[in-house]
Curated annotation (Swiss-Prot):
Known role: Catalyzes the ATP-dependent dehydration of threonylcarbamoyladenosine at position 37 (t(6)A37) to form cyclic t(6)A37 (ct(6)A37) in tRNAs that read codons beginning with adenine.
Membrane topology of this protein: Multi-pass membrane protein
Segment forming the signal sequence: none
Family annotation (SUPFAM superfamilies): Activating enzymes of the ubiquitin-like proteins
Enzyme Commission designation: 6.1.-.-
Gene Ontology CC terms: membrane; mitochondrial outer membrane
CDD domains registered for this protein in UniProt: YgdL_like
Taxonomic lineage: Eukaryota, Fungi, Dikarya, Ascomycota, Taphrinomycotina
Enzyme class name: ligase
Family: Belongs to the HesA/MoeB/ThiF family.
Keywords for this protein: ATP-binding, Ligase, Membrane, Mitochondrion, Mitochondrion outer membrane, Nucleotide-binding, Transmembrane, Transmembrane helix
Protein name: tRNA threonylcarbamoyladenosine dehydratase
Length: 468
């Protein structure tokens, strides 16, 4: 410190005290900053799923399976852990107050299978577990995506990229550890049905959004007499006042439900499956199926964009609460059914005799016209044409709904279902006498307005044939 002179008012001792205090303060500040830095690094590292000890394998169906450290119980059956019965009853106190001892005994001895663990299925599973269902098997091949967090009831950011079944199973352990969860990271198909639906379940819940997989599941349950309830599409829906439960034969205004009904009817299944659906009609002002960009089409095969072959590649817009409403509705239906809680659901009816009469009329008309049919019509097809295409009413104004049948529209066109029109019996007799018997074009008998209405129905039928 040459040339530096300490002021006379500062003593030698006080000078070094000041220097040491400054050094100490600097060390404390730097140490604190370094500590905060390391703490932030550790926090960020804890948010990242560790890769060590984890590998990717494919199941027999080509679905990725996450394999974690052997010390973690992530896949398969979680037997549940010993848990004090008094604590269980306290946690389920409101359910005991609602269902009573007998109802809760049924629920706590029940076994439910949920196929599909996405927006709808996750809400179903969540409430079944919170309501005391003792054993739940959950089936899904897919993984949690970031975009699915807007509607999934359980998954978190840390679950993104992991199997949906694993995310749900781990979550249930945190609030109901006594429940047995059988997590199956698998794709449901006819080959896996016997295994995935084994164990004599009290209920099977269909929360699938793929048409053919849904049909495979529902037809299996129907043929094996397994109690089942299905969810139709909650995407593009926004009106909660229009959500209903009805027999599948009475549902409407939903493309997924319509396509499912049609395929089930071709398998001879016309009714007997309850579904949750929305009566909300499509509206050009509302959300609809998003088209693929021209860029994706230019790249080549757009089917490669889907998760699996025959699964949709285009995006269905969905507002988060709607899958929850569907799922909670299903959960309530299943819980009250298993507990045998008094319910008075609105009944829906089909008209099997009417369908059979329509079949007989068509075959009689073919014989009378000397037409050799390539195939015989059946009641399932008549049900589809009358109830789906013509909404249970005559195609001719004023569109009456009583005593509806089906007739060939234009005798100069092929005798197939794309040339069939719903009419009342009186209208059908008039049509047979003035159009079919004279072998003339319907436009020579009916006015322009009637022709346009009928053709709009026929266009709808042909469009649905192409789509579904």
């Amino acid at each position: 410190m040459a040339g530096f002179k300490v002021p006379s008012w500062i003593t030698y001792k006080s000078f070094w005290i000041a220097v040491s205090s400054s050094v100490t303060t600097a060390c404390v500040i730097l140490g604190t900053l370094e500590f905060r830095k390391h703490r932030s690094i550790r926090r960020l590292q804890s948010m990242i799923v560790p890769e060590a000890g984890k590998s990717i394998q494919l199941s027999s169906s080509g679905v990725p399976i996450e394999i974690y450290d052997a010390g973690e119980e992530d896949e398969g059956i979680s037997k549940g852990v010993p848990y004090d019965e008094n604590l269980i009853r306290e946690q389920l106190a409101r359910n005991y107050a609602f269902f009573g001892e007998d109802g809760m005994e049924r629920l706590r001895n029940s076994f439910v299978i949920v196929v599909g663990c996405g927006g709808v299925g996750s809400w179903v599973i969540n409430m079944l577990a919170r309501s005391g269902v003792q054993k739940i098997r959950i089936v899904d091949f897919d993984q949690v995506s970031l975009s699915s967090l807007n509607r999934h009831s359980i998954a978190t950011l840390q679950d993104v990229g992991t199997p949906k079944t694993l995310a749900i199973k781990k979550a249930i352990k945190k609030f109901a550890p006594w429940i047995e969860v059988d997590a199956r990271n698998a794709l449901f198909n006819p080959d896996s049905a016997d295994d995935l639906l084994s164990g004599n379940p009290d209920f099977v819940i269909d929360a699938i959004d793929n048409i053919q997989t849904k049909v495979d599941l529902l037809s299996y349950c129907y043929n094996h007499k397994l109690p089942v309830i299905a969810s139709t599409g909650s995407a593009c829906k926004s009106d909660p006042t229009r959500v209903n439960i009805a027999d599948i034969s009475a549902t409407s205004e939903d493309p997924l439900s319509r396509a499912t009904r049609r395929r089930l009817r071709l398998l001879g299944i016309m009714e007997g499956i309850p579904v949750v659906f929305s009566t909300e009609k499509p509206d050009p002002r509302k959300a609809s199926l998003l088209p693929l960009s021209e860029e994706e089409f230019e790249k080549g095969d757009v089917d490669e964009l889907s998760a699996l072959p025959e699964f949709r590649a285009r995006i269905l817009p969905v507002i988060g609460p709607m899958p929850g409403i569907f799922g909670l509705t299903i959960a309530t239906y299943v819980l009250t059914s298993i507990a045998k809680y008094p319910m008075d659901p609105i009944s829906t009816m089909t008209r099997p005799r009417l369908y059979e009469e329509a079949v007989k009329r068509l075959h009689a008309e073919a014989r009378k016209a000397g037409v050799n049919l390539d195939k015989t019509f059946n009641a399932s097809e008549m049900s589809y044409i009358i109830e789906e295409v013509y909404v249970g009413r005559s195609a001719l104004p004023p569109h009456e709904s009583q005593k509806v049948t089906v007739v060939r529209w234009n005798p100069q066109l092929p005798f197939d279902h794309t040339n069939l029109v719903a009419m009342t019996r009186n209208e059908a007799r008039y049509h047979e006498d003035n159009v079919l018997a004279k072998n003339v074009d319907p436009s020579t008998v009916y006015g322009k307005d009637v022709i346009e209405v009928v053709h709009s129905f026929l266009r709808r039928l042909r469009m649905w044939e192409m789509l579904y």
